[in-house]
Amino acid sequence: KVIETFESMGLRFGRDVNAYTSYDETVYQVSLPTTQKQNLQQVMAIFSEWSNAATFEKLEVDAERGVITEEWRAHQDAKWRTSQARCPFLLANTRNLAREPIGLMDTVATVTPAQLRQFYQRWYQPNNMTFIVVGDIDSKEALALIKDNLSKLPANKAAENRVWPTKAENHLRFNIINDKENRVNGIALYYRLPMVQVNGEQSFIEQAEWSMLVQLFNQRLQERIQSGELKTISGGTARSVKIAPDYQSLFFRVNARDDNMQDAANALMAELATIDQHGFSAEELDDVKSTRLTWLKNAVDQQAERDLRMLTSRLASSSLNNTPFLSPEETYQLSKRLWQQITVQSLAEKWQQLRKNQDAFWEQMVNNEVAAKKAL
């Protein structure tokens, strides 16, 4: 019936109606093509039912087992195998290492409707929920709809949302991922470090410093590859990824040209050592700041044209991560003022902090185990 209701509004699953579950949250998203009160009321009624009165009929549960199992099987490729081989290193000492968000297939095959209902009643409760409405709708009207449909939901006792502290692995590790379907041979250095929780000006600056270091490395690496200075590397990147509510990983990866792992490893270590000794130039930093401020200013000037789904995603992220939500104008003005405190000296200190971090591991992705052993 829910599917029929959504389709009667012109909505399609996957395009307009979506949901996802990660390690830490479940998010339902509905994008309406109109703000007609009748449609809004119907959607709110569905959300109310999902929030308190979801059913777990045996036939539906059994059908969903097959859907989840097929989804799991469809992802058993080289990318998945690589992720599985990396997880013991990347997710060490986190609860995320125990299982993927999709769950364990033994559990999927055997869990009963009663167990699902118990889990749902423990976690999927209104007091664990944030409801976000974005669109061309009067805020008072939207608030009234929320109150009419959700305020009468019973305040059942929900499980406490605990944060399990991540313990550092303070020693260097080595990981070889050998898969015959890997298309490139590459080498990477991963660092694990506490997540910056942005709740004030100082943490705002610190997060920007980490982000700028990643951008500066990427910018320099790409310039040197394109100019032909780095002949043993065909590509590379630096990125920062969240690995737990309180922890992140910052990594540097390069792809070996002609599968020459030894030369690629030497090139990456040389690039890192150059930054160790000389850092980044004032010109490089000014260029990154200027580019970012231009992008932020464009966001201010183009607010009327911004994508509502992106805005919804930003609001959801702010709620899920318990961080302040800033408007484009606030973000631009705050960045313009606070980034003046970011200098090549402060970035050099942040870089040295990273490089002295012992919670790190080298990783090689290869399709030839002999090449990997030679490089190590």
Regions found by a protein language model. Name each.
Residues 1-31, 98-102, 215-248:
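M16/MPP (pitrilysin/insulinase) zinc-metallopeptidase core fold and M16-derived inactive scaffolds
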Residues 28, 88-129, 161-165, 193-203, ...:
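Histidine-acidic residue clusters that define the catalytic metal-binding segment
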Residues 58, 65, 117-148, 356-362:
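Non-catalytic, conformational "gating/processing" segments within enzyme and secreted inhibitor domains
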Residues 130-135, 283-376:
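C-terminal regions of mature proteins
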